[in-house]
Amino acid sequence: ESDFARKVHPIREYFNALPLLNPAEHGHIGRLLNTVQVANPGKWEEYFTKWLIGVVANAMNDTGCQNHTCLVLTGDRQGQFKSWWLDNLCPTPLKNYLFTGKIDPQGKDILTLIAEYLFINIDDQLKELNKQNENALKNLITTPAVKYRRPYDIYIEEYPHLASFMASVNGNEFLTD
């Protein structure tokens, strides 16, 4: 750490710069929820709101908060804009902190994503996971911190869990337990 440069956290700075709004007065979450067709709107509102609060709590607190859920959009077929909708949850100024694609739950790169990104959008991969990778993914979603060595660093260090997970999948048959 440098004594000459202050530590910056662009995600926290973004959230801190937002105006405070009364949710009951503005209804932004409700309007967003209405852009997705679901079988049970009440559960959708409850689970999405909890997940979204978890996203902000994760971003604003290094300890004590981990978003232990993965928001998953399902649909009967491709081309229903599931991944697009999820990607657009990330505000434009924070697009550099959004990862969309396939991950290796047992690889080292995912640790960097968890520590440095706001969102990890697992795109059309949930059905492909074997039991070992499925368990590894569950562990990654719920871990409070990750340990790894950054490129050119000498030592392994611990970093708080920043990222919140989301995913899209075709069909509903992806949970095995």
Regions found by a protein language model. Name each.
Residues 3-119:
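P-loop NTPase catalytic core of nucleic-acid-dependent motor ATPases
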Residues 134-157:
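Conserved catalytic/switch belt of AAA+ P-loop NTPases
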Residues 100-104, 146-151, 168:
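Short gly/ser/thr-rich secondary-structure transition/capping motifs
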Residues 63-64, 158, 175-177:
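Short, conserved, surface-exposed binding loops centered on an aromatic residue
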Residues 118-141, 174-177:
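Conserved AAA+/SF3 P-loop NTPase catalytic/coupling segment centered on the Walker-B
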Residues 110-115, 150-168:
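AAA+/SF3 P-loop NTPase mechanochemical coupling elements
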Residues 169-173:
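Short, polar loop motifs at secondary-structure junctions
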